[in-house]
Curated annotation (Swiss-Prot):
One of its GO terms (molecular function) is iron ion binding. Keywords: 2Fe-2S, 4Fe-4S, Biotin biosynthesis, Iron, Iron-sulfur, Metal-binding, S-adenosyl-L-methionine, Transferase. Homodimer. This is Biotin synthase. Belongs to the radical SAM superfamily. Biotin synthase family.
Amino acid sequence: MTVSPVALRRKTECKPHPTARYWKKCDVEALFGLPFLELVYQAAEVHRQNFNPREIQLSTLLSIKTGGCPEDCAYCPQSAHHNTNLGKEQMMDVDEIVEKAKIAKSRGASRFCMGAAWRGPKPKDVETVSAIIKAVKGLGMETCGTFGMLEEGMAEDLKEAGLDYYNHNLDTDPDRYNDIIHTRRHEDRMDTLGKVRNAGLKVCCGGIVGMNETRAERAGLIASLANLDPQPESVPINRLVKVEGTPLADAEDLDWTEFVRTVSVARITMPQSYVRLSAGRSNMPEAMQAMCFMAGANSIFYGDKLLTTGNPDEDGDRILMEKLNLYPLQFEPEGEVAEVEKASGIKADY
């Protein structure tokens, strides 16, 4: 059965698991309005009911094709519409990508995420990334791809190649979507999410805060994510990285407590999803990150670069995790890869 964009929106009577519900925007905004420590406490309780609170999923994100994107996303330095001095590059060589994945695994990452600056891939691009996915899967890692909007059959091809997750963010509140992006619609995002779900892929879907939105608009973003049916397996929460030359370079700074509130509300409304601290973490003090982990964040991007912007270095993350008595979630490979690891005794070194 085809999953249509409308079918992805959760209905009040549609409850695929006991903790799912339909979230009205006003109800999500009410959560945002709780006293700060009460909200964090509630989120921490929900988190402990669904996850080991000491486990953190480590993912590495690599830009395999950088710059020259035809989309005009106001936050993105890779857009060809913005003067950010970021040139258009060709896709990385397959062997180079696989070598990056090997390094990521040796340093503790269990998931390897690949991004390409496309509006959407061409059929020949899908063939190329499928070969990359197969090679990375052969290392015993989970794979995630973010390649833009997909045409019919592409999600199935990626699934057949071994892709585990497809990232396709909803970016912001649907009501202000075209204030941020003019070259596509919110409905276009929903269409690709429908194709991804129909192919049997897991969904990584989140958004960006700190783009001059109101609290009510942050609530709208979280409600739109929580009402996806089923809810995303991974929810990246990005804090805007302001890049000179983009329309949002002078955006007002988002108060750190408001970011923690966003993480908390995401955890409460999406109790079984991995909530990932994504872009903007390099500007977050350790205490702020610790509060986010308390509030239910249980995944980070690991490595000193996220596509084109900075990220905390690996040594710093190791030290922080040791301070907080956290440890990395290990991905358990299946099939032939699992047998090889079992026989060799080789595991990720963390």
